[in-house]
């Protein structure tokens, strides 16, 4: 009877060691990510204290948290914030129970009432009045009641992706070509490095077909989100941004 007990104690001891190592590893990873995230310049703004326009007549949804996500055409640290267009506009809805996330893009060239009955491209609302005006535009035109937002520029997006260890993204031949081209500019503007992806040889007959899945770093992922010259044009661009 003693042998089974010794074996059980040994297995329990091994499990305790494994759990301890996983815990230590988790703390290490958390520390590494936290240290990198601390390098991101985060500016918090309470929109509730500003003149954000809400739509009181819009249907009130319960059990969901909704955010407006803005990708800013802000490239240099010397440029003043809130004066640039938001070339990426995404509405993110999170199910509070299941944590499932649904993303809907608003095309940047959509003609909307951006401020005081002034109609222009949706991406210009941010330049007209910062996040307050951009969120108000969404509420006014789309019957929403959003009060929270996240805005991110090139530098922050590159840093966040690198903190996550990169992203695995399926790419077509055409996407590789355009992404490599964009990487040159993105790298220069952010000061971050990258390695160009080698083009498949031979060149596929269908340049729009997926050729493989590639691991992208921050510069590459940001450049991937900027692609708009494939056959699907801006529809394809917004789809890439939601991945």
State what each model feature region is.
Residues 62-65, 84-89, 98-106, 117, ...:
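Extracytoplasmic
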Residues 63, 162-243:
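Flexible, polar/acidic helix-loop-strand segments at domain edges
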Residues 70, 76, 109, 137-147, ...:
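Structured segments of extracytoplasmic/periplasmic soluble domains
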Residues 75-81, 100-103, 112-115, 234:
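Short, solvent-exposed loop/turn elements at domain surfaces
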Residues 76-81, 120-128, 143-148, 211-212, ...:
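Second-shell loop/turn segments in exported
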């Amino acid at each position: 009877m003693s042998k089974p007990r010794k074996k059980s104690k040994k297995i329990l001891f091994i499990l305790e060691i494994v759990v301890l190592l996983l815990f230590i590893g988790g703390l290490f990873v958390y520390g590494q990510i936290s240290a990198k995230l601390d390098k991101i310049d985060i500016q918090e703004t309470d929109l509730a204290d500003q003149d954000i326009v809400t739509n009181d007549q819009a249907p009130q949804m319960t059990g969901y948290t909704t955010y407006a996500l803005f990708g800013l055409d802000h490239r240099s640290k010397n440029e003043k914030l809130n004066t640039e267009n938001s070339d990426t506009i995404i509405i993110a809805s999170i199910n509070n129970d299941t944590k499932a996330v649904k993303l809907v893009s608003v095309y940047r060239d959509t003609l909307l009432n951006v401020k005081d009955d002034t109609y222009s491209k949706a991406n210009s609302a941010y330049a007209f009045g910062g996040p307050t005006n951009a969120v108000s535009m969404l509420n006014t035109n789309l019957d929403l009641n959003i009060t929270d937002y996240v805005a991110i520029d090139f530098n922050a997006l590159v840093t966040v992706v690198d903190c996550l260890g990169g992203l695995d993204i399926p790419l077509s031949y055409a996407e590789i070509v355009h992404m490599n081209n964009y990487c040159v500019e993105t790298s220069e503007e952010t000061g971050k490095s990258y390695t160009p992806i080698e083009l498949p040889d031979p060149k596929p007959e269908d340049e729009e077909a997926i050729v493989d899945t590639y691991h992208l770093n921050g510069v590459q992922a940001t450049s991937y989100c900027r692609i708009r010259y494939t056959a699907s044009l801006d529809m394809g661009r917004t789809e890439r941004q939601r991945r």
